[in-house]
Amino acid sequence: MTHQFPALSPEQKKALSDIAQRIVASGKGILAADESVGTMGNRLQRINVENTEENRRAFREILFSSDASISKSIGGVILFHETLYQKDSSGKPFPAIIKEKGMVVGIKLDAGTAPLAGTNGETTIQGLDKLAERCAQYKKDGADFGKWRAVLKISSTTPSQLAIQENANTLARYASICQQNGLVPIVEPEVLPDGDHDLQRCQYVTEKVLAAVYKALNDHHVYLEGTLLKPNMVTAGHSCPKKYTPQDVAVATVTTLLRTVPAAVPGICFLSGGQSEEEASLNLNAMNQSPLPKPWKLTFSYGRALQASALAAWLGKSENKKAAQEAFCKRAQINSLACRGQYVTSGKTDTAATQSLFTASYTY
């Protein structure tokens, strides 16, 4: 018989479960503000703003210093290492600002992808070295949850069984290390939207990936009540000629989750995967309106799909701060409604909200 050493104490389990429940409390989701320096540079480049530490800090200050009502829509904020140690213009650390609003601070923990030998261009994730020490330090510095993103792609030869197993195992090792150090692990196995595959192919692959992930989490004695899942929605490939409705996406996604994700998991926080802001909200809303059983909270962990309108309103100008904050708050409120299946689209959305945010082979 297998045994878990060291086992989590009842107190550790309760602390992890409480954090996870706070993040996905009713109508709340996650703001993913953990873009790396390079990825943030690409975002700033689109609005002709230079990628400096100050500009990155200034934009994130806009998001974090938004009206206190934002905490009704956002339960947690994922930060990049740089951002965890930055301050607002008055000298207050960002984690303190986030916590004062009643939101939970998270930290990106993976160190990006590395080629996986023996596969056709597939990858595994780096960052397990010294992860326990990093988790302990981040916990001291104010973080209460972590995030680790694994990436799988769909093609005629991928994902391979090797890539699925390797990434599932790495996610499980990360999750176990997080929990030993008091951090709730967000488990993110992303099946990329690149390609021309249809909805059914994405569903088949996502089911295989999630089944492998939960087998690995069980093998590694991960306490599921103290975790969150951040999966892709089940959508057709970006180049698929056939278009599907939000209802199609909802049925395929919820069916996939029912087949693979234990009811013990408190919340499923979808990534937006390059969908437009509006598309991501409509798909989430359709899932929460679905008559299928949903034993977990279905919510969001959006980066691009929460920030695009705010970036477009800001344009790097301090005088646009209020407009950018209003755009961000509006999008957060829409997604909060979508978490409850209560979003009714007016049909009038601005260009930034309907623009595709897809980037091929997207890296964070």
Swiss-Prot record:
Q: What class of enzyme is it?
A: lyase
Gene Ontology biological-process annotations: fructose 1,6-bisphosphate metabolic process; fructose catabolic process to hydroxyacetone phosphate and glyceraldehyde-3-phosphate; fructose metabolic process; gluconeogenesis; glycolytic process; liver development; negative regulation of pentose-phosphate shunt; positive regulation of ATP-dependent activity
- Give the catalytic activity: beta-D-fructose 1,6-bisphosphate = D-glyceraldehyde 3-phosphate + dihydroxyacetone phosphate
Necessary for preference for fructose 1,6-bisphosphate over fructose 1-phosphate (site feature) positions: 364
UniProt KW keywords: Cytoplasm, Cytoskeleton, Glycolysis, Lyase, Schiff base
Q: List where in the cell it is found.
A: Cytoplasm, Cytoskeleton, Microtubule organizing center, Centrosome, Centriolar satellite
- Hey, which pathway is this one from? Carbohydrate degradation; glycolysis; D-glyceraldehyde 3-phosphate and glycerone phosphate from D-glucose: step 4/4
Q: Can you provide one Gene Ontology molecular function annotated for this UniProt record?
A: molecular adaptor activity
Per the record, what is one GO cellular component? cytosol
The protein's Enzyme Commission number: 4.1.2.13
User: Pfam families given for it?
Assistant: Glycolytic (PF00274)
Q: Which residues bind substrate?
A: 56, 147
Q: Which residues form the active site?
A: 188 (proton acceptor), 230 (schiff-base intermediate with dihydroxyacetone-p)
Per the similarity annotation, which family is this?
Belongs to the class I fructose-bisphosphate aldolase family.
Note, other: In vertebrates, 3 forms of this ubiquitous glycolytic enzyme are found, aldolase A in muscle, aldolase B in liver and aldolase C in brain.
Q: How does it assemble?
A: Homotetramer.
Tell me the protein's name: Fructose-bisphosphate aldolase B
Q: Which organism is it from?
A: Gallus gallus
